[in-house]
């Protein structure tokens, strides 16, 4: 029994196909992971933060799903699977909470955005 001989052309096509498949999978996983975060902060220092249960109640009543609600420093962070869910939650929470709160979307979870914002913030130090 003889094994077929692999030519250089076949090896090149096979290697190219494997590399292309790998790049496609890498790009797909990067685009698929698009978490979005809402941050709720009080404008005035004396204003108390809303508790996570009330936020959960309002989002659940409007059919908006979220991944987590986490207090961090003086901010309440709400993580969503997509920017669309985050935008819908922002509309609901803007209606729900009084004007003493800032509700802002934070979609800069990837490292490229963090590096760009770091470079933008520190550009005045050069020269």
Curated annotation (Swiss-Prot):
One of its GO terms (cellular component) is plasma membrane. Residues 33-127 are periplasmic. InterPro entries: Modulator_MzrA (IPR026574), SecD-TM (IPR027398). It comes from the Bacteria. Residues 1-9 are cytoplasmic. The chain crosses the membrane at residues 10-32. The keyword ATP-binding does not apply. Keywords: Cell inner membrane, Cell membrane, Membrane, Transmembrane, Transmembrane helix. NCBIfam families: PRK10629.1. Interacts with EnvZ. Belongs to the MzrA family. This is Modulator protein MzrA. It comes from Escherichia fergusonii (strain ATCC 35469 / DSM 13698 / CCUG 18766 / IAM 14443 / JCM 21226 / LMG 7866 / NBRC 102419 / NCTC 12128 / CDC 0568-73). The gene is mzrA.
């Amino acid at each position: 029994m003889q094994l077929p001989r692999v030519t250089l052309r076949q090896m090149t096509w096979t290697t190219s196909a494997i590399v292309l498949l790998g790049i496609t999978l890498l790009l797909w996983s990067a685009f698929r992971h698009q978490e979005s975060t809402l941050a709720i902060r009080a404008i005035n220092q004396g204003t108390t933060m809303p508790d996570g249960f009330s936020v959960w109640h309002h989002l659940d009543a409007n059919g908006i799903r979220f991944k987590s609600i986490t207090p961090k420093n003086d901010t309440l962070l709400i993580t969503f699977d997509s920017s669309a869910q985050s935008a819908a939650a922002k509309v609901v929470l803007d209606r729900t909470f009084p004007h003493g709160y800032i509700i802002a979307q934070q979609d800069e979870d990837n490292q490229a955005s963090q590096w760009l914002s770091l470079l933008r913030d520190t550009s005045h130090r050069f020269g």
